[in-house]
Each structure stands twice: as C-alpha cells, then as structure tokens.
C-alpha cells in the first residue's frame, strides 16, 4: 500500500512539473488466468484455491488464515486489462483511478 501511495505522489509531481499526462491506476485484489497459486505469496483467490485443493487431496480440513471477516473487493484480470486500456485512452485526471467492482465480500461469505 505504501509503494502505491508513493507512486501516486510521484505521478502527480511529474504531471505538475513536466505537464505529462501520467495517471495512477490502482486495481483491487486481482484474480485470473496465469495467477500465482503459491500459498505463501500468491493473491488471495488463487492461494485459497490451492489451499482448498491440497486439503481435499490430502483429506485434511480446510482452514482460512485470520477470521475471514474483512471485506475485500476482487476484480478479474482481463477486466483490469480492458479498464487499463480505457484509462490510458480516456482518463485524464490527477486523482488516481481505482479499478474495482464495488462489490465487497468476505472470505467466509456464502
């Protein structure tokens, strides 16, 4: 999160100082084809899929780290690609654009 904030500050400074049309695009939790299914450092959705697969394969219970209650927003990787193309062509604001579905769900939500 800190790196994203710092990148946004840098982009704003470049826009102001050099007059370039840089924008800040911030996606929420991404999932999709060719994702990182590593349990330790992958994204939320593929990590959970891999954890569930291993639990079923080894006939072990499936556990989720933490309470599973925090609300998160997820977005499909191909939607991120389309929205990024749109932002490059159409978006010209100094405020960052957050790519999100605006649907908040918890990991425990049915």
Which role does the model predict for each range below?
Residues 1-28, 44-58:
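Active-site Tyr-X1-5-Lys
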Residues 6-7, 76-79:
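Conserved cofactor-binding/catalytic machinery of classical short-chain dehydrogenase/reductase
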Residues 25, 64-65, 99:
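Hydrophobic residues at beta-strand termini and immediately following loops
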Residues 26, 79, 109:
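Ca2+-coordinating acidic residues in Ca2+-binding motifs
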Residues 30-47, 57-61, 77-78, 86-99, ...:
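Glycine/proline-rich active-site loop of Rossmann-fold NAD(P)-dependent oxidoreductases
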Residues 66-70:
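Catalytic Tyr-x(3-8)-Lys segment
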